[in-house]
């Protein structure tokens, strides 16, 4: 039954993430906060892969059997995890660059707010989708008998735009501080 679905990429990603977790816990080489963020990133990616498989399976085989509230929970958690990756990667890079010491207190606090506000908006859009579904469909819907349906409006694109924003900001800050980064830090950033 699983072979009828196109799970190749999800299963491959899941296996890579499990291998990463296994070898990661064999030897830790980065400080504790960075270690926590890195392990959280890998756990979130693993959760994304599992939820993607569960969502696809529910759409194809269990459309009428799984309660809609469980489907909403799966989809909202999946999109939250997908968008959390870019935020956590930005935090991971900023911790490795030790920006708290390089920036003034005011500038560093601005950077924190700059990271939190778009992410909070993104999560708000994702988790309001089931609440506002009957009034105004946001990014996606769960339709009885059909399953997951992507809405063709701007609300579907906003979480992806916010994710891209985090990756671009991280890339720009890495370029700005490229001369200050040691070889080992560059290696850690390229995980």
Map each language-model feature to its residues.
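Hydrophobic transmembrane alpha-helical segments in integral membrane proteins
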Residues: 1-19, 154-161
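Short aromatic-rich membrane-water interface segments that cap or initiate transmembrane helices
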Residues: 1-3, 69-81, 145-159
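Hydrophobic alpha-helical transmembrane segments of multi-pass membrane proteins
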Residues: 8-29, 33-92, 112-131, 189-191
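Membrane-interface helix-boundary motifs at transmembrane edges
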Residues: 25-39, 94-111, 174-185
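Hydrophobic transmembrane alpha-helices
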Residues: 47-55, 118-139, 154-191
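Juxtamembrane/interfacial segments around transmembrane helices
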Residues: 62-69, 91-97, 166-177
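Membrane-anchoring/interfacial helices and their immediately flanking loops
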Residues: 88-158
């Amino acid at each position: 039954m699983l072979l009828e679905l196109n799970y190749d990429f999800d299963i491959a990603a899941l296996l890579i993430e499990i291998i990463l977790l296994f070898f990661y816990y064999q030897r830790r080489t980065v400080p504790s906060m960075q270690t926590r963020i890195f392990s959280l990133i890998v756990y979130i990616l693993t959760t994304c892969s599992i939820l993607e498989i569960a969502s696809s399976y529910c759409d194809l085989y269990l459309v009428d059997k799984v309660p809609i509230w469980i489907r909403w929970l799966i989809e909202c958690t999946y999109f939250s995890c997908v968008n959390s990756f870019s935020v956590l990667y930005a935090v991971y890079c900023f911790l490795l660059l030790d920006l708290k010491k390089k920036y003034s207190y005011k500038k560093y606090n601005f950077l924190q707010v700059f990271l939190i506000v778009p992410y909070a908006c993104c999560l708000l859009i994702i988790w309001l989708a089931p609440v506002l579904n009957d009034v105004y469909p946001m990014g996606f819907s769960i339709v009885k008998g059909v399953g997951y349906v992507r809405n063709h409006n701007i609300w579907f694109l906003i979480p992806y735009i916010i994710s891209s924003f985090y990756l671009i900001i991280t890339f720009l800050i890495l370029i700005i501080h490229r001369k200050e980064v040691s070889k080992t830090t560059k290696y850690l950033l390229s995980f």
